[in-house]
UniProtKB/Swiss-Prot annotation:
One of its GO terms (cellular component) is mitochondrion. Component of the mitochondrial ribosome small subunit. Its main location: mitochondrion. The keyword Ribosomal protein applies. Belongs to the universal ribosomal protein uS3 family. InterPro entries: KH_sf_prok-type, Ribosomal_S3_C_sf, Ribosomal_uS3_C, Ribosomal_uS3m_plant. It is found in: Mitochondrion. GO terms for biological process: translation. GO terms for molecular function: RNA binding; structural constituent of ribosome. The gene is RPS3. Pfam families: Ribosomal_S3_C. This is Small ribosomal subunit protein uS3m.
């Protein structure tokens, strides 16, 4: 009698459990109910329409296990053809992996008080400037009430954004409750004056970075949608990107901000045409950093005194450093916080670009010799005397705690983490299971069976390609550490009149008979004009001593 083997999915570390109810019909039906319930819920939040790209189920993967449910949201950038259109529309911000989740709208639906309340905005097409009436997607009865459809095809976009937010930006800064204290008067007036009178400052990418277009019009939770500039969590909006990456970045201010401000921009070495654009972007970033260094770290208007104060505290940092600190393991906070987060009480804008460049160059050279983590508390005590704003000091103390203890950013200080926690608790109560929601940044699509299966399904839906060409493309992109891959297609592969058949493609070793092998498996169904196609993917990871098995697919 043949030996009954365990299913391949049990071989993964997270599935290895002694729960005997894995094969029972009761729990199988429960998993199916949870999956259907979750998918119907996500599909009803923001369905795709002619005006909106929507929240598509292809952007999330729901994995059910005996004791846990994992929901992974994938936040890709917009297609390139849509990016080129957006270059002529400065009012629209580009889709980035850390902001797309907020635009997709699943969390906003949870906090809405009135499901039938209309939210009207004016969306103008590129060709015909006609008014388009957009409504909240929760009111499904009025989805098709669209007036004045543009002549030209309108691009996909999220129509519930305010295009005229920058007109009232200085007014919002002055009346915001976060800066009503007399200590903030000089800072608010300085920023508002700069916004109103300096058009070149509005066009810079650093302006779009700190003053993003994320505000909502009305509602009881509008305080969560206010500008990042008028929220106390401004520091965490900026630091969120750095703490989500496990590997620390070398602190070159130009490189860091270039990577942060323009994440989708091509490198100058890869595109010859982008050399001039890259240099101009670096110049703008350098000048803007110098402006913040001069205007935000000094209490007086004298540039020479500000330079002396900065040089003095750099020397303090050098005296506190310890042996063993290298350029690749430096901490981001001390000088990043000193250049961006210490506000001042005076008003003054300097126009000496040469002095700015000298100050910036001195800062960049001295940043390589940073203080060690065990001495960072002593340095911060000296840095506190430069600030004078109590709320920022509290935030700085919390940032120190995050760096020293390697914690994540507390959800109560950031609306993103706060809303994710609310959504996690909502889904856990609805499905009676422990639901985990994680926003992930994909390292490589071709090292996870579920992602490869999703990619194949998208290719078969959008355009008819031969299965051999799809498999050949996947084989070329397989990273190191993957020992082998096997893909099987089943169904009516070519024509509706053809009988159903199965084709399997194999690359290297993909043995499913050895229990100790680390194998990932994922099935997916593709709905085509000829019927349903089944796609199954097996990936075998290598476990040699010289290489580590790629079991961690995502970078949290």
């Amino acid at each position: 009698m043949a030996r009954k083997g365990n299913p391949i999915s049990v071989r993964l570390g997270k599935n290895r459990s002694s729960d005997s109810s894995w094969f029972s019909d009761y729990y199988y039906g429960k998993f199916v109910y949870q999956d259907v319930n979750l998918r119907s819920y996500f599909g009803s939040i923001r369905p795709p329409t002619r005006l909106t790209f929507g929240f598509r189920l292809g952007r999330c993967i729901i994995l059910h296990f005996p004791k846990r449910t994992f929901i992974h949201f994938f936040l890709p950038r917009r297609p390139r053809r849509l990016k080129r259109r957006e270059k002529t529309r400065p009012g629209k911000e580009k889709g980035r992996w850390w902001t797309t989740f907020g635009k997709a709208g699943p969390i906003e639906c949870l906090h809405s008080s009135d499901d039938t309340e209309e939210e009207r905005n004016e969306v103008r097409g590129r060709g015909a400037r006609k008014r388009v009436e957009s409504i909240r997607l929760d009111d499904r009865k009025k989805q098709n009430e669209i007036r004045g459809w543009p002549k030209k095809k309108q691009r996909y976009g999220y129509h519930d954004r305010l295009p005229s937010i920058k007109k009232n930006l200085s007014k919002l800064l002055r009346i915001s409750g976060a800066f009503k204290h007399p200590k903030y008067a000089g800072v608010v007036n300085d920023i508002a004056f700069l916004i109103e009178n300096d058009d070149s400052f509005k066009k810079t990418k650093l302006f779009k970075l700190f003053f993003q277009n994320k505000s909502r019009s009305d509602g009881p939770t509008s305080y969560l949608r206010t500008l990042p500039a008028v929220r106390p969590s401004l520091n965490f909006l900026v630091m969120q990107y750095f703490f989500n990456t496990k590997n620390q970045i070398n602190f070159d201010p130009v490189v860091v901000l270039n990577h942060f401000v323009a994440p989708g921009a091509a490198e100058p070495s890869t595109m010859g045409r982008a050399n001039a654009q890259g240099r101009s972007l670096q110049k703008r970033i350098r000048s803007r950093i110098a402006f913040f260094v001069e205007s935000l770290t000094s209490e007086k208007k004298c540039l020479a005194e500000a330079k002396n104060r900065l040089t003095h505290f750099i020397r303090l940092a050098n005296d506190l450093r310890f042996a063993g600190t290298t350029k690749t393991t430096i901490s981001l906070f001390p000088f990043f916080g000193a250049t961006f987060f210490f506000l001042r009480d005076g008003v003054g804008v300097y126009n000496n670009l040469d002095a700015r460049e000298q100050l910036l160059n001195q800062l960049r050279v001295k940043c390589w010799n940073l203080v060690g983590k065990d001495k960072i508390m002593e340095l911060i005590e000296k840095l506190k005397n430069l600030g004078g704003i109590e709320e920022l000091i509290k935030v700085i103390d919390m940032m120190i705690e995050i760096i020293l203890r390697k914690r994540g950013i507390p959800y109560r200080y950031n609306s993103y983490f706060y809303e994710v926690k609310k959504m996690r608790s909502f889904l856990s109560n609805r499905t009676n299971t422990k639901t985990l929601i994680e926003s992930v940044k994909i390292k490589s699509v071709y090292q996870s069976a579920s992602l490869i299966a999703q990619d194949i399904s998208f290719q078969l839906k959008n355009k008819r390609r031969s299965f051999h060409s799809i498999f050949a493309k996947i084989v070329k992109e397989i990273p190191k550490g993957v020992e082998g891959i096997r893909i099987c297609f089943s169904g009516r592969l070519k024509d509706a009149a053809e009988k159903a058949q199965t084709k399997c493609y194999k690359h290297r070793k993909t043995s499913c008979n050895v229990f100790n092998h680390k194998i990932d498996y994922a099935p997916v169904e593709v709905f085509t004009r000829y019927g349903i196609l089944g796609v199954k993917v097996w990936i075998s990871y290598s476990q040699k001593k010289g290489r580590r098995a790629i079991s961690e697919t995502y970078e949290i």
